[in-house]
Curated annotation (Swiss-Prot):
Keyword Disulfide bond attached: no
PTM annotation: Some glutamate residues at the C-terminus are polyglutamylated, resulting in polyglutamate chains on the gamma-carboxyl group. Polyglutamylation plays a key role in microtubule severing by spastin (SPAST). SPAST preferentially recognizes and acts on microtubules decorated with short polyglutamate tails: severing activity by SPAST increases as the number of glutamates per tubulin rises from one to eight, but decreases beyond this glutamylation threshold. Glutamylation is also involved in cilia motility.
Region (Disordered): 429-449
Classification of source organism: Eukaryota, Metazoa, Chordata, Craniata, Vertebrata
Molecular function via GO: GTP binding; hydrolase activity; metal ion binding; structural constituent of cytoskeleton; structural molecule activity
Record PANTHER family: TUBULIN (PTHR11588)
Name this protein carries in UniProt: Tubulin alpha-1C chain
Organism of origin: Homo sapiens (Human)
Described function: Tubulin is the major constituent of microtubules, a cylinder consisting of laterally associated linear protofilaments composed of alpha- and beta-tubulin heterodimers. Microtubules grow by the addition of GTP-tubulin dimers to the microtubule end, where a stabilizing cap forms. Below the cap, tubulin dimers are in GDP-bound state, owing to GTPase activity of alpha-tubulin.
Database matches in SMART domains: Tubulin (SM00864), Tubulin_C (SM00865)
Record's GO cellular component terms: cilium; cytoplasm; cytoplasmic microtubule; microtubule; microtubule cytoskeleton; nucleus; vesicle
Length: 449
């Protein structure tokens, strides 16, 4: 069996975790107490969901997941919520004082008190797996726990499970809707520390999700629940191939093989369609061609950047539901003719396609309409560098005045780490620039890789 362990870190990670596991349970017919009624199982006979759930002797299905936060309030909601019986109490790990939006607290002072306990729990989960293929780590860039503790955890996972894949789902700080002043510091410190430990990181920009909720679902003031439910649909689409019998991206390494041309260039852009409210869906056909086309609209992306200004290095289309290859080929052919899609010149214009016949599930009473088919596009494009440039700029504005730096130094960090992290980010921006440059100019630059 090819199991995946999900690790949800900090408030953002935990709340997205709630939305994701709620959706997984609905998709696999698992009740909030972990039981799977026998009438549900006979039909499929597909046990691929065991990659995400382990079954106990009593027939209860337990998520292969760990929830970690340095303060208890958010995880206490899981402990008392609808799905409290789903998780093993040991899978919900809380500290006593939070990281106070401070990377240094999450990574050094508070984080190191709890890291061994967390690794011990992860080890227990890993021991239940017959063929662990890797970890999915959910966290935000901006929070103290999400940034600091995640980077500490990733370093330790690399030591303990060197060969296993580590995929991240990272919440990128929204330009308009900021929850902390020091988000740029935390983001850049965590990106620098995790860059060499993460194999593939899907970024989700809160603001992009806000806009999608406002525009496509007519929610005037989206709440985090609205955002998380939308994010969970995307996560579910990306992981559907791991949880149902599929043909493409059946394991985590395949994602990397398909999307990551160089180790550092591992930030694919995710786009999901159709995001549509029930009232509208009733009057629309949403054909394969339409939803495929929607994926190339910057408005449907999870990160605000414009791929029309960048070049594509790789592109995966993951369909689910009532989709036949003939329609997909036609849709892609149309897009190739009329879209201004530029691939880098060293990469053939290949679209990799996966089809999963399990139709998308929606949370009852949620915002999304139940549709027959959906698509998630994962593309590695040089346009993502725009997102880094925005963050780096904000970092520079604050760091030029050394604003707030004393809070980090006071927790045992050295100021040199800031400039080191910033230099690494500058190098990352440069890497993106070079990858997009035409290969004819870059003959002498091959030594770096």
């Amino acid at each position: 069996m090819r199991e995946c362990i999900s690790i949800h870190v900090g408030q953002a990670g935990v709340q997205i975790g709630n939305a994701c596991w709620e959706l997984y349970c609905l998709e696999h017919g698992i009740q909030p107490d972990g039981q799977m009624p026998s009438d549900k199982t006979i039909g499929g006979g597909d046990d691929s969901f065991n990659t995400f759930f382990s079954e106990t002797g009593a027939g209860k299905h337990v998520p292969r997941a760990v929830f970690v936060d340095l303060e208890p309030t958010v995880i206490d909601e899981v402990r008392t919520g609808t799905y409290r019986q789903l998780f093993h109490p040991e899978q919900l790990i809380t500290g006593k004082e939070d990281a106070a939006n401070n990377y240094a607290r999450g990574h050094y002072t508070i984080g190191k008190e709890i890291i061994d306990l967390v690794l011990d729990r992860i080890r227990k989960l890993a021991d239940q797996c017959t063929g662990l293929q890797g970890f999915l780590v959910f966290h935000s860039f901006g929070g103290g726990t999400g940034s600091g503790f995640t980077s500490l955890l990733m370093e330790r996972l690399s030591v303990d499970y060197g060969k296993k894949s580590k995929l991240e789902f990272s919440i990128y700080p929204a330009p308009q809707v900021s929850t902390a002043v020091v988000e740029p510091y935390n983001s850049i410190l965590t990106t620098h520390t995790t860059l060499e430990h993460s194999d593939c990181a899907f970024m989700v920009d809160n603001e992009a999700i806000y806009d999608i909720c406002r525009r496509n679902l007519d929610i005037e003031r989206p709440t985090y629940t609205n955002l998380n439910r939308l994010i969970s649909q995307i996560v579910s689409s990306i992981t559907a191939s791991l949880r149902f019998d599929g043909a493409l991206n059946v394991d985590l390494t395949e994602f990397q093989t398909n999307l990551v041309p160089y180790p550092r260039i591992h930030f694919p852009l995710a786009t999901y369609a159709p995001v549509i409210s029930a009232e509208k869906a009733y009057h629309e056909q949403l054909t394969v061609a339409e939803i495929t086309n929607a994926c190339f609209e910057p408005a449907n992306q999870m990160v605000k950047c414009d791929p029309r200004h960048g070049k594509y290095m790789a592109c995966c289309l993951l369909y689910r539901g009532d989709v036949v290859p003939k329609d997909v080929n036609a849709a892609i052919a149309t897009i190739k003719t009329k879209r201004t899609i530029q691939f880098v010149d060293w990469c053939p214009t290949g679209f990799k396609v996966g089809i999963n016949y399990q139709p998308p599930t929606v949370v009852p009473g949620g915002d999304l309409a139940k549709v027959q088919r959906a698509v998630c596009m994962l593309s590695n494009t040089t346009a993502v560098a725009e997102a880094w440039a925005r963050l780096d700029h904000k970092f520079d504005l604050m760091y030029a005045k050394r604003a707030f730096v004393h809070w980090y130094v006071g927790e045992g960090m050295e100021e040199g780490e800031f400039s080191e992290a910033r230099e690494d980010m500058a190098a990352l921006e440069k890497d993106y620039e070079e990858v997009g440059a035409d290969s004819a100019d870059g003959e002498d630059e091959g030594e770096e890789y």
